[in-house]
Amino acid sequence: MLNIEKARTVSAGLPSAIRLKVARTPEELEDVYRLRYQVHVIEDGKFGEQSFPDGRIVDAFDDMSYVANIVAYEGSEAVGTLRINLDSGQGLPPEEHYNFGDFRHGVTESWNRNHDTPARIGSASMLAVQRSWRHRRDVIRAMFKLGAGIGHSWDGSHIIAAVNAKTAGMYERIGFESLDSEQWIEGIGDHVVPMACKFSAFHSWAFGDLIDSLKTLDFFSYRFQRVILAADKVVFRQGDDHGEAYIVDIGAIRISKGGESGEELTLATLGHGQLFGELSLIDTQPRSAQATTLTTTELIALDREDFFSELEAQPHRIRDMLKIFPSVCAAPMNWPLCWRMVPPSSVLSIR
């Protein structure tokens, strides 16, 4: 049963919406680099004598083949960021501060004995959250959840980090373990703790039973965004034309529709693990109902552009993707919509 009243009280004073995504545009990446500088240098006074004349912190690891800079926005303002990397031969950011050689050797030997594919080690680094937002654990958790999905989509086996000693407890709560005592890093001007975790454990913490119940969404991990909303906020209105589908991770959603006499009719109340708005991914028609948060709510979001990009990239998985829409594609009136999803090269494979 949804405990709506208890959760509703938590939302008092929250901003209307916080959106978390992977920074992809030049403008979003600029927001990431400037936020790092604002947090680490201006707010926290770290990085000692290092000079950042342009007010940005950016390094070679931002140009790696496997890099994802996650950014959290309140409106147009970036309030938090986290970087995820996967090693492709040039090392990882935490190895600038600690020798993870023994850990690498041990997990690589163990992994390779028990798996057909080699160990793939990634990292979490450059966590930066505005001081006024550091009490918002839900925002920080949501950044790490996005990171877990990204690492999973890259087939990562393990993740390492050299974390601020003050935040080590937070990392432990999401599955990381300390590899050594805290170390003083002169270049940063602070103590760090080397930590590591299996990506499978990290992913399990982030998604729990969601992927078990919605297995066909697994291959969209890199495309997901997350949206955090206070109670009584509209996700979308009847008649809107924005193409985005959602899964409820935390909280509750009311689906409603305007009646003939002007009253609002409740069609459904949705909770953890339930999918809604999925027809908008394949149909450009306006929304047929309204979705409103009943409590503080965290949603996993997938937009139409990302959905079709993944469809084109993995045409061999079209049959699995169609399983996301069992009720939609079962209705004859929607068959033309579902058929438009199928690339010509996949027609034979789904007959």
Q: What positions do the PLM features span?
A:
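Cyclic nucleotide-binding regulatory module and flanking cytosolic helices
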Residues: 28, 194-234, 281, 313-326, ...
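A glycine-centered beta-loop-beta connector
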Residues: 73-77, 251, 262, 303
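Cyclic-nucleotide recognition modules
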Residues: 108-109, 268-326, 330
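Acyl-donor binding region in acyl/amide transferases
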Residues: 90, 94-178, 182, 188-191
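Short amphipathic alpha-helix that is part of the acyltransferase structural core
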Residues: 7-58, 67-73, 78-79, 213-216, ...
